[in-house]
């Protein structure tokens, strides 16, 4: 068995009494993505309307107490929370997309395409417009309620999450909820609408340390669920009968891996608005560059999702300065053609 594994190009990695089979090439690619994230993050930290030279940036990170008040505020209260929020939300959406595509066995599946984002958005928007005194910590909870409600509605109408019509029904529900969001926007106060429009476009400019902490607290359970059920998900891909014969509890697995992406997506939408197509693109890119099982797919999707959001946010912030284009708009410009190509390639299955 060990010789066969080595001949296949895998290397066993022991961790906490478990063994994962990883390709050395995949490890190198993952390491290169991490280095790219680090380099892009440092570049984003140093660029903006108030540029920070490399020497000043390094000194600020090592000894922040020696900085002036203005550069310290810009670096630690504006740019750093924004970059970390981009990384976190991108990773959350990448994980959500990978899990949704796995459980539905459909490469077109994405929580954003089945109305989860719109469900979370409409509840959070109602909370912001009509109950502005509600604390920030309750927004992800409200978004999660909306996202789960929409997911249950789509699942009930489609009857089976593995059928192609699950995606089509989700798109229809998503458009209906988008119309409801438009009704909210036309009846609310103009000042509130302006703020809501920036948030709905997927802007990270309002990222703060408290908001980042809230997002992390809601993201952690979803990520833990997905990684803990990754091995069972690999077995489930062999077929229902085989999985049951090997001891996989399919019903519990389906419930966990269906609602974990809903939790991750709802938390992301509640904090930074809609970042479309990240959950659709990241898993496909991860499969192409990393390959392997669910653990490899989840890790790759999280890294690539983080890279997509950070890159598009940096581009939208710097390319047209002083005008800042929300990351959600930049991602949509890339994601729409990507979705059309996927739809065309899978047209016979729909």
Set out the residue ranges of the language-model regions.
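Alpha-helical transmembrane segments in inner-membrane proteins
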Residues: 2-350
